[in-house]
């Protein structure tokens, strides 16, 4: 297996929206699980205060990430309108095609750090670690 493509997006929530975010994210998880069979992992995490969340995605390649963005486009738009205050950082690990780089820069927006580490230095991926 080639090195995976890993995406970590960190977002500040609108005040008092953690419970609504959890409900919305549960719906998103169902959509991703049903419509993205190539996705290796898709998980969300919140800080203890419930003011910031991070979404961690592991894809087999950038094509999978681009497909993901098409699948969840409307959900992302809705989340920004009603739940997210702002994106605070985007981290990408793995090869990033030019089209994917443009997509990430658009997603990051102006002033949001887009951190890209494209050069693998080693590791492994277990697909059946259960």
Q: Model-predicted segments: where are they?
A:
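Conserved acyl-CoA
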Residues: 80
